[in-house]
């Protein structure tokens, strides 16, 4: 099993949904960075369960503890261990379905691959695993902000059939995103989303959605062609998030329907540098950042755990009706916002450190 990500800024996560705790070990964080638990907690609070009526009823404070790697509030350059205790475990919710592979979950594939699996919750496949990446991403964001002034902001673009419009990626802030519990900054659309999700929660069903993310102030030159292009690493990071099913950058699939004369980003002189008049490339050309905002979208499927009865089969082939008792989000996208931001930060910092490492060779 692969639980590590990154080359120079390397993170290794651990823990399952109903074990004693989850966390991450960070290798490669630069020394001398001012870092407190409060710096990390802000992002964890944005992803924790039980925030509002649109999320799971599981109650977790998700209080982070820095176990190593800092002294007197500064990083030492040694491994940083970040840990969060699980406090509201209910493994008993899964006792009567332990022999039933839940539809669209990892139960079947984990059992077939490893011959054993965590019988309660999703184990390593649970979204609890993302606590580690969000914590490590919060550290990465602080480095990126200090070194380059990089800002990473994600928001909910759509929920089920409901689509937001008129959101300016160049100016949107996290404060604007967090004003709505749906994390859609389009106030009118946000109200429609919240109503739709609430109705689904009452029915015991779920829906999916799309998260858009913008990375601003990225320097030119990040990315390692050919096989570690910046968009390729971003895609890998985003598709590693539980429930993610699609990734597109810049014009994405819609760009395939344009002409070259429509799609090409023409170069112009602006802000005392060479830039582009449009951004259909999404801030990346040839697998390397070009200095324009990096804009991408991630699609998330409907939450697999629903309360409605579903006909499925046991591992021995017996047909049974399953009705899940576990707590779940009727739609994951609002809580996916800090996860998407954090995974993007992990990619950006690792690529930035790799680029910086070659600068002073001669």
UniProtKB/Swiss-Prot annotation:
Keywords: Amino-acid biosynthesis, Aromatic amino acid biosynthesis, FAD, Flavoprotein, FMN, Lyase, NADP. This is Chorismate synthase. Belongs to the chorismate synthase family. FMN binds at residues 124-126, 286, 301-305, 327. Its EC number is 4.2.3.5. One of its GO terms (cellular component) is cytosol. InterPro entries: Chorismate_synth, Chorismate_synth_AroC_sf, Chorismate_synthase_CS. Reduced FMN (FMNH(2)). NADP(+) binds at residue 47. GO terms for molecular function: chorismate synthase activity; FMN binding. It holds the Pfam family Chorismate_synt. Pathway: Metabolic intermediate biosynthesis; chorismate biosynthesis; chorismate from D-erythrose 4-phosphate and phosphoenolpyruvate: step 7/7. It catalyses: 5-O-(1-carboxyvinyl)-3-phosphoshikimate = chorismate + phosphate. Its cofactor is FMNH2. GO terms for biological process: amino acid biosynthetic process; aromatic amino acid family biosynthetic process; chorismate biosynthetic process. This reaction introduces a second double bond into the aromatic ring system. Homotetramer.
């Amino acid at each position: 099993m692969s639980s590590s990500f990154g080359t120079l800024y390397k993170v290794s996560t651990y823990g399952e949904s109903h074990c004693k705790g989850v966390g991450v070990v960070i290798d490669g964080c630069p020394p001398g960075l001012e870092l407190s638990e409060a710096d990390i907690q802000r992002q964890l609070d944005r992803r924790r369960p039980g925030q509002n009526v649109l999320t799971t009823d599981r109650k977790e404070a998700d209080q982070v503890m820095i176990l190593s790697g800092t002294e007197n509030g500064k990083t030492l350059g040694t491994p940083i261990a970040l840990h969060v205790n699980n406090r509201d475990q209910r493994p008993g919710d899964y006792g009567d379905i332990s022999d039933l592979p839940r539809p669209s979950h990892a139960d079947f594939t984990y059992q077939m691959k490893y011959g054993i699996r965590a019988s309660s919750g999703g184990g390593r496949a649970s979204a609890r695993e993302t606590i580690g990446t969000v914590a490590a991403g919060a550290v990465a964001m602080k480095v990126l902000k200090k070194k380059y002034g990089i800002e990473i902001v994600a928001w909910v673009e759509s929920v089920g059939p409901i689509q937001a419009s008129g959101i300016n990626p160049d100016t949107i802030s996290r404060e604007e995103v967090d004003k709505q519990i749906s994390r859609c900054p389009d106030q009118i659309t946000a109200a429609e989303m919240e109503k739709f999700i609430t109705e689904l929660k009452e029915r015991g069903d779920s829906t999916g959605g799309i998260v858009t993310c913008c990375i601003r102030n990225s320097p030119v030159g990040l990315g390692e062609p050919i096989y570690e292009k910046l968009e390729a690493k971003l895609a890998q990071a985003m598709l590693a998030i539980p429930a993610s099913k699609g990734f597109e950058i810049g014009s994405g699939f819609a760009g395939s329907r344009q002409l070259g004369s429509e799609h090409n980003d023409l170069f112009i002189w602006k802000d005392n540098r060479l830039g582009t008049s449009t951004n259909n490339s999404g801030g990346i050309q040839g697998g390397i950042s070009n200095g324009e905002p990096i804009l991408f979208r991630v699609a998330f499927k409907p939450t697999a755990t629903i309360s409605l009865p579903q006909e499925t089969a046991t591992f021995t082939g017996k047909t049974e009706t399953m009705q899940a008792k576990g707590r779940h989000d009727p739609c994951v996208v609002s809580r996916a916002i800090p996860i998407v931001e954090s995974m993007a930060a992990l990619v950006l910092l690792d690529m930035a450190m790799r680029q910086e490492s070659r600068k002073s060779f001669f």
